[in-house]
């Protein structure tokens, strides 16, 4: 079978044979002859046992391709997929007595199998792989010519052979032949048990078979028996579309064989289901995601729309009837442009009391939908969502009566699901009936209790909200003993909250159009109200204690609360309150007062939790309070600094809040809150904290100076006088970091870092420049412990420290040579020291001759360099290295001078031969002047200062006392201070010479 194939897409019109399998040879696939127990192949001569014979499919179909007809015979195992089993398996299935009843003969079984094959193939399109197209007369190799030749000869159907059959769309799946055959067998067996030979009619199978035997079996009364015989699973499998064959349940309504009694029974079931849905809705089922509403709708869209319109008309008529008798009883009226209300009166009779459930509120939407909760989906197809949550059962019965005339309309069946979905849907409805009936009785009992309490109250508030452009409505609050009902009406989104039980209502916080001061202004005796609004925290506090109050108070955009003073015990007045419905005014006021007295702590908690809205109660007004909105400090700052003078709740006079929650307030009064004083009070607090930090810094410096004095017990005598005065005056500037840079030894403890005086002057000044919302520019975060904005004068003990440097002797054993305390003002700053050379060739005898000794290091405070993170000495920046005086003399290797060992340095310091030392120094200086243009200084051989850890660099011009006034050069000296003392090595003041680095 290796022939070439051509593919043909065609639709099956009819079957051409009734035998679909044949015994075939395993070698040549030809038909074999079965003789008794043996089989013989006439083509190839192979033989075998008849019991082991293989069977092969052979299906002959009449197909059409556009305007051409063909008879295609399909062979082979390619049909196994469509039959559901192999040809050999199908043969064994038919011959099995356990599968096929004994009452069915072979002919009947074959007829049922033929029906099953027709159901599976007829009307479907397939792609056939044709193999014998070359044997057609006049056929060429071109496929188009082949199709053209086949359509010749007066449109005669040409016989073709196909070895392949596939579906055009592999994704399409349908029932197989064996499935349909199994369904037909079950139906036929049921009729045999009922002693009636009946089978499904041709219409139900969508077939048109002309077999006389089948026609004699089938009757028109077989529909009901067929429905009864099939189980739910088999029924759904039978009616599921097979391939492209579709059967819709709605065809049952057009069937003449469908009896009138069964139609009335079906419609009765539908009406009962609709009533059960209405009852479930009337009982106020709280679940908005009921599976009933998520399933297929039992009402078409047109039916829903017309039903909603009729319901609106009926509700309007009912409203007129009820409003006609409400004159002697109180009423609840909620008026808004987005709602049309139905005013419900309190029934006079007990029979009418049972039917009273709640007020009817229907949204005026284009979809005519009744919303349940605000989270309900808008796209829900049904127009009667949770209608019973608002409607009394009597109105629902009116609506059902009005729409009952449409129940017999066959158009209702258009929206029904398929049978398998309908069965599940009806099962869900049946399971809901028991729960619904139990729920109805409990709901009615609950309604009776509510109406009894409603009778006891005899008073209601009817408030018409005032529409304000740009501002949302304040959520109304209903306070009740049994439940708390919060109804929020927004101009854009209308929604309904139901908070039941002891739960606190969820008051929606709405944004106000501005941040102005809010106040409560209420007048009594029905006079005009102020336009100030009660803040949301206060409303929350009132609603949180609703369990203690039985009166329903409805609050809208303009809060209308009757005043309550100690001298005035007027009630909550209502302009719409009827004369016969009033209760004692004193009782209501006492309840409100008790309510507010018990729950004032809740007000405090709510105000503390508000992020940027705090309450400030005026102390000079006994009958009023002002709501102030503070925008500057967040909640964190309020919690972290409880002592700050912000609008905390400790300033609220809770003593008279108990009696003045609803006190009257003058219309034009806006409170006496001074925001500027409050803001500057914060700055004063910050300055007090800054003063405390300054004192701490003074203590640190005192300890530091004491430790420094203790480190120089023999050479130093520090004076710590007037230390506190130095820190108070901020006029002079000093950086403690730079002081420790060159003055003090490494054993001293580090001092804290201070900010610059510019920042201090900004904070210390009283020139406060508020922003647009009167917020302070600097908060508490600018006052830091480690950096106070304050500059200090140079302490006196530092000058004393410099004086002690001069008192130290160069030669300890020689008491005659002491340093003079003169300190000139022309001392270089560290910036000048960096650029100054260590040795200068320019002599300045006229400047330094009158100085007997080195001068102390003192800098001008105005030229003081800010401190740095790293301490770098001028000698280190120039690349020089400090060496001792002995190494200084030995570094040059004078020809007439021997190297001075380090151990002889002590002898030089203590020697009394001044002339010898003077001569050596003169020779050294002469050599320096001679070689200054050629000698290059490096860190290893030409350093001047010793590497001793107790020596640091100081920039000051010095002349050795033993050199005399005739010296014309500059020298470097090593001062033999103690290890703990702060030594100093001075350098001369001279012009910078670039020749030293050439």
Curated annotation (Swiss-Prot):
Residues 815-834 are annotated as: Disordered. The gene is DDIAS. It comes from Homo sapiens. This is DNA damage-induced apoptosis suppressor protein. Disulfide bonds: none annotated. The keyword Cytoplasm applies. May be an anti-apoptotic protein involved in DNA repair or cell survival. GO terms for cellular component: cytoplasm; nucleus. One of its GO terms (biological process) is apoptotic process. InterPro entries: DDIAS, NA-bd_OB-fold, Rep_factor-A_C. Pfam families: Rep_fac-A_C.
